[in-house]
Amino acid sequence: MILHAQAKHGKPGLPWLVFLHGFSGDCHEWQEVGEAFADYSRLYVYLPGHGGSAAISVDGFDDVTDLLRKTLVSYNILNFWLVGYSLGGRVAMMAACQGMPGLCGVVVEGGHPGLQNAEQRAERQRSDRQWAQRFRTEPLTAVFADWYQQPVFASLNDDQRRELVALRSNNNGATLAAMLEATSLAVQPDLRANLSARTFAFYYLCGERDSKFRALAAELAADCHVIPRAGHNAHRENPAGVIASLAQILRF
């Protein structure tokens, strides 16, 4: 079994750019950024429980990493960068720390490196279970209307929220709930030590208005790019800023 994805081919000899969307996103989420790098082959992946991969269920990050490895092999991708937002960033960090043959580097936008104590994990587990129950039982428009009121999305205006609620409500609530629980921060290990000891290139992007993730970025041994005029979802709010940072990263 492999993950559903869309492949766009560039020039031979350059590494692939493998894009991983956030929770409730889809393989189109990164395309405005990705299409600015037409020389590179690009793979836009649907994570389990989402879009073309909605029928794929996982028990945890190990399963996601295994599926991602098999997906890259199926496309004969031998050298690549992982570029992930939020949940996709956490998947990228986990996969990189577990080992991905052919990995050139990781670019994470607004991805959490992991909670640091049992109390935080227990609190997050309670919260994610409550959200998962709502995703399973309530209309998605109502759930996402509340989802985008969370503090991390404070930089969004009302029009941006309405647009995201409409877009995300095309998902399957039951499969989203299953993925939310399987990849909860409550079950993700703290990756700070692994990332400090890494053997791969690691870059972190965060919006200048995303105070929570700017603070987290400061804890990581990573080259951090702050994206102007953007909050948590920087590649949506300022794609040109993210394109500029990614171009700078790929030039090294």
From Swiss-Prot:
Q: How does it assemble?
A: Monomer.
Q: Which family does it belong to?
A: Belongs to the AB hydrolase superfamily. MenH family.
| BP GO annotations | menaquinone biosynthetic process
Name the record gives this protein: 2-succinyl-6-hydroxy-2,4-cyclohexadiene-1-carboxylate synthase
Protein's job? Catalyzes a proton abstraction reaction that results in 2,5-elimination of pyruvate from 2-succinyl-5-enolpyruvyl-6-hydroxy-3-cyclohexene-1-carboxylate (SEPHCHC) and the formation of 2-succinyl-6-hydroxy-2,4-cyclohexadiene-1-carboxylate (SHCHC).
A Pfam entry, by short name: Abhydrolase_6
SUPFAM superfamilies assigned to the protein according to its UniProt record, in alphabetical order: alpha/beta-Hydrolases (SSF53474)
The record's InterPro entries line, in alphabetical order, gives: AB_hydrolase_1 (IPR000073), AB_hydrolase_fold (IPR029058), SHCHC_synthase_MenH (IPR022485)
GO MF terms held by the record: 2-succinyl-6-hydroxy-2,4-cyclohexadiene-1-carboxylate synthase activity
Q: Which gene encodes it?
A: menH
Question: In the Enzyme Commission scheme, what number(s) does this protein have?
Answer: 4.2.99.20
User: Which pathway does it serve?
Assistant: Quinol/quinone metabolism; 1,4-dihydroxy-2-naphthoate biosynthesis; 1,4-dihydroxy-2-naphthoate from chorismate: step 3/7; Quinol/quinone metabolism; menaquinone biosynthesis
